[in-house]
């Protein structure tokens, strides 16, 4: 491969890493990210945790950087994302025969919305794309000069990649067909005992990464009785058998057409119209020049697209990432057509595509900048305020995304917090309350834990609000704001487990406008203006939209960046408010509010009916039972 391709790869990798580092989430997040951040700091990696390669790299990164686990794992994603973009340069250059075209295609992918958002948080997708691109590159290089050394390199990297994500199996049909088509001695030569043995050894080595997870089963409180049971439990957990059957290839028929609309929205969110058009042209060019490579890219795209399209999960957009990669790769050969117009046409076309990518990066930069996002930490810190294991225990039942954040916060940030899950202690909750009261410890409950306890035990437990946690009403966010203060309120259809309090929303909008405001009924809505006057913008839609306006000479853009029918999980938020090119508000489902100054700096923010809404807390006790407590009771060791 020419040196210029390696130089271009290094340049793009460094530029991408710099971009991701600048917009990096500084710490804790909810959802799977919170789980990864927790597990990487834990001593055991169980089969349920899976991802042995990802966690091995993450643990090494935590040890090398000496950073808190959350920040270190976020940073590892940025580095992996940069490396992935470098690999994309090399693979695209191999497909197109042009380092410039490869670099331009990689830049287009580097600034695509979803990949950028996944490269600034602790997630497996940046490393996944790096390994997909590396596997493809090695396979293409083998086809240039078939030899056992290059074939071993391909087999080894492809097998290694399964330690990060099992969806690498989606590449197997395309890779297999290409190997058979490109084998210089015919397809039968790929089944020679030597090659089969090499492939089997590489596969075994890749599978051996999971020995780490398997071994952890014997270190748990309930170890398996033998290797047979261990393997059954291992397979059940690693492959997520308990929910796989309800999600894979299980999109309801009524939503199939909606998924098509969602995909078109998602594809344009990544590349605009230019990307898909170039990919279509590039695929035609590839088929004409080397039909085997055209078949390879088509099969790789089709398998990953079909899986994501049929995957009934709340964050299907991230599973389209590999298919987006192949769209970007296919765009590179399209640029080489420009040589028919001008002998320097490829370079000119590459520069134009790079400029296009730069314009998209400039436009999306404020919205994708999470460097100032501390919302998850703030939510958990407020929920656990005043708690420590000497004087209190928290019994929680939370949305799973928030609970993952609590797991990290209570194990790494504030390990002195003692907590447990309500489902784990429900059968003996009164005894738990009594025993902790006997040693001077309060028992605090989250809201859903309170509901569960009241339903199970009724008058046997006395439950009252914890005065240490004050949950403001939504309308309180508008109190005492000076007249003329800029604001934006967004209202998105909430998740099914969270209800929208329309009366509270009406009070907020009325307090901001100084008069009643008609409430929205559509899935997406936004209100913007200045306090004391009716909203300058009151827009609602059944489809995602973008609204640009000026509020008191401040340029504001309201972006709805989600497809609510499919999206129940959006780590980057479901939309954004950008004011004066500053990330003023991350929009979530339910109600999101920000008041801000002329420079776009938020003066006050509030959330309701979503996972970032303030969480109430309660204290539970046994009625008419007073626990004698000595003066030293609070200093006794926790029970």
Residue ranges and their predicted role:
Residues 287-291, 333-362:
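Signature aromatic-anchored transmembrane alpha helix within multi-pass, membrane-resident enzymes
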Residues 10, 75-96, 134-138, 281, ...:
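Transmembrane-helix motifs of polytopic, lipid-linked glycan transferases
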Residues 52, 56, 65-86, 118, ...:
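Loop-to-helix entry region of an early transmembrane alpha helix in multi-pass inner-membrane enzymes
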Residues 143-144, 171-203, 414:
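Perimembrane helix-loop-helix junctions
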Residues 268-291:
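Hydrophobic, aromatic-rich transmembrane alpha-helices
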Residues 273, 296-298, 306-339:
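Hydrophobic/aromatic-rich transmembrane helices and adjacent perimembrane loops
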Residues 6-7, 11, 88-111, 149-153, ...:
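Transmembrane-helix signature of polytopic, membrane-embedded enzymes
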